[in-house]
C-alpha cells in the first residue's frame, strides 16, 4: 500500500471517527460526511488511474454527483431545523417528531 493510499485511508478513518464521536452539531456531522466522500473520491480516482480501467472512469464522477446531492439535502435540512427549532443539536432531534 503506497503512502498516498494510506493517507487517504487515514483521512477516511478520521472523518468516520469524527462523525461517530462529535455528533453534537449537525454542521460538524455534515462536514465529516463531506470529508469521507472526498477521501473516497480520491481513492477511487487513484485506483482507476493506476489500474487503467477505462470502463470504470465514470464511477468517481457519479460519486461526486451523489456527494453534491447529499450536501444540498443536508444543508437544506440544516436550514429547516435551525429555523424551526432554533438549534442544530443532533441529540435533541427525534425522527418521529420532526
UniProtKB/Swiss-Prot annotation:
EC number annotated for this UniProt entry: 7.1.1.2
Biological process per Gene Ontology, one example term: ATP synthesis coupled electron transport
Keyword Electron transport annotated: yes
Protein name as catalogued: NADH-ubiquinone oxidoreductase chain 4L
Subunit description: Core subunit of respiratory chain NADH dehydrogenase (Complex I) which is composed of 45 different subunits.
A GO term, aspect molecular function: NADH dehydrogenase (ubiquinone) activity
Functional summary from the UniProt entry: Core subunit of the mitochondrial membrane respiratory chain NADH dehydrogenase (Complex I) which catalyzes electron transfer from NADH through the respiratory chain, using ubiquinone as an electron acceptor. Part of the enzyme membrane arm which is embedded in the lipid bilayer and involved in proton translocation.
Short name of any one Pfam family annotated for the protein: Oxidored_q2
Enzyme's top EC category: translocase
Catalytic activity: a ubiquinone + NADH + 5 H(+)(in) = a ubiquinol + NAD(+) + 4 H(+)(out)
Annotated coiled-coil segments of the chain: none
Protein's organism: Vampyressa bidens
Amino acid at each position: 500500500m503506497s503512502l498516498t493510499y494510506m493517507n487517504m485511508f487515514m483521512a477516511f478513518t478520521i472523518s468516520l471517527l469524527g462523525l461517530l464521536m462529535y455528533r453534537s452539531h449537525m454542521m460538524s456531522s455534515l462536514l465529516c460526511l463531506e470529508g469521507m466522500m472526498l477521501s473516497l473520491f480520491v481513492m477511487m480516482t487513484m485506483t482507476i488511474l493506476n489500474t487503467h480501467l477505462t470502463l470504470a472512469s465514470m464511477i468517481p464522477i457519479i460519486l461526486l454527483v451523489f456527494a453534491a446531492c447529499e450536501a444540498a439535502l443536508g444543508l437544506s435540512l440544516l436550514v429547516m431545523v435551525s429555523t424551526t427549532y432554533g438549534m442544530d443539536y443532533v441529540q435533541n432531534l427525534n425522527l418521529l417528531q420532526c
